[in-house]
């Protein structure tokens, strides 16, 4: 019976530890180096050139975060190049409404692939900002 409790405790610990490392972040600058490993001594793998691009943090080591993007590219980025601002990229064209209801005034058409900043969300609606539009 002790082995069963130990196994359950072990499983719970590693499940919550793994999920704690996974968070969503955005790129802070319009030019961010992605490296092969968690340090400046590792060579640059590729360079992002999009500010606010959403990425998912999947691991961390000291001041570096391992990230993965929407196209499943992954690598290591220094924490100074990341921020905790939520952003999204819609997969299809969307309509931006002035209020959180389908009956409110549409104020813009959002093209797929555009980076949108998320200000806050309820169960069904998110308040977003893109360029000069907000809704």
Each language-model region and where it sits:
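Bacterial N-terminal signal peptides
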Residues: 5-15
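Short, active-site-adjacent cap segments at secondary-structure transitions
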Residues: 135
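SH3-family beta-barrel domains
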Residues: 18-36, 46-51, 58-132
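Second-shell loop/turn segments in exported
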Residues: 38-42
